[in-house]
Amino acid sequence: MKFFDREREINEILHILNREPDDIYFIYGPLNSGKTALIKHIIENKLSDDYKVFYINFRTYLISEKREFIEAIFTTKKDDFFEKIKDKDEVLNLITKGVRILTGIPIPEVEFDKLFEEKINDAFQYLNSLLLEVKKSGKKPILIFDELQMIKDVVLNTENQRFSAFPSLRFGNGQKYLLKELFQFLVSLTKEQHLCHVFCLSSDSLFIEYVYSTGELEGRAKYLLVDDFDKETALKFMDFLAVENNINLTNEDKELIYSYVGGKPKDIKYVVEESKFKDLREILEFMLKDAVQKLDMFLDMLNYSKPKVDVGDEVIEIKKDNVIEALKLFKDEYEVSKKHIPVPVYTYLIKRNILFLNPIEGILKPQSYLVWNAIKRLL
């Protein structure tokens, strides 16, 4: 399928790339709002060969220690045929003359093995030296971390214990957190050396809230929201998909689709494609019933379990009555100020992918229109 719209976001990111690197950019938004599709469209279709992109996708990794982080970001292979990188000359060829997009930081196998024995800063210094070589060759380096929150719990210590990087969770004394070390390195790349553009993608709004609120990156980071489509854009997207799939959608059909799934690109695409051989209203009702059942099971489990979340130094038990009270706020409103819901409750609902938080605006909303409609139908 051809890429659709997002001209405002595309132009903003291209404008950033035309400037000297000076900030770390966090691209965030609800689940399935199109963050990865957007950044891939830009690096694959909108950039000249003057750029060299290092795209690291943490989505497929379970990272709990330094070794797994190193395995995720570095590669000893030259291409898809798994030919090994022999020496630094081959690395230099890859980063200065090879393809525009690399899905790992190239490193000779012998050097790669050494990284496991050394400090994490040695790995960062190796990457720094590569980025300097890219710049020396006349190209502009771009570093992209997709689903960066996957490393938020990694602790740099000999026991490889796991503690959360969030201030709301309890720390171990003297622990060094990989995320903090990485942020310091990224600040060096952008604010200090002006060497490399850095983009960090995440659908975890609690992670973005942590980054935004701690002040650790104050004056060093900017935030770009990739949200679900607004109604006007969603209706245009339906027209676009109808043409792509040779389907006739009336205005009433499009209004009906929007009333169920809103501007969620993935949901709209599914509905339009399914409508080619199924009844439209049946598709939408099935999706809503599924969302209602999932929400109902979630609430029912609260009759038998006592979930807890950590807030500061306290462990707070979440009660079903408080959850229902919070969700009822969305019966008449799609967006609610986070001040209207206690922190432990909205934290729990975000963790369960029921709510999404925009920390920059302090606004909470359901993760999707389907979830919103499920709340209204069930409560």
From Swiss-Prot:
Is Isomerase included in the keywords of this UniProt record?
A: no
* Listed InterPro entries: AAA+_ATPase, ATPase_dom, MJ1010-like_2nd, P-loop_NTPase, WH-like_DNA-bd_sf
Q: Name one Pfam family in it.
A: MJ1010-like_2nd
Ordered alphabetically, the record's keywords are: ATP-binding, Nucleotide-binding
List each coiled-coil range: none
SUPFAM superfamilies in the cross-refs: P-loop containing nucleoside triphosphate hydrolases
The terms under GO molecular function for this entry are: ATP binding; ATP hydrolysis activity
For binding ATP, which residues are annotated in this chain's numbering? G29, P30, L31, N32, S33, G34, K35, T36
The Swiss-Prot or TrEMBL record describes its family as follows: Belongs to the archaeal ATPase family.
Q: Which PANTHER family match?
A: ATPASE DOMAIN-CONTAINING PROTEIN, DNA-BINDING PROTEIN-RELATED
Its recorded name reads Uncharacterized ATP-binding protein MJ0801
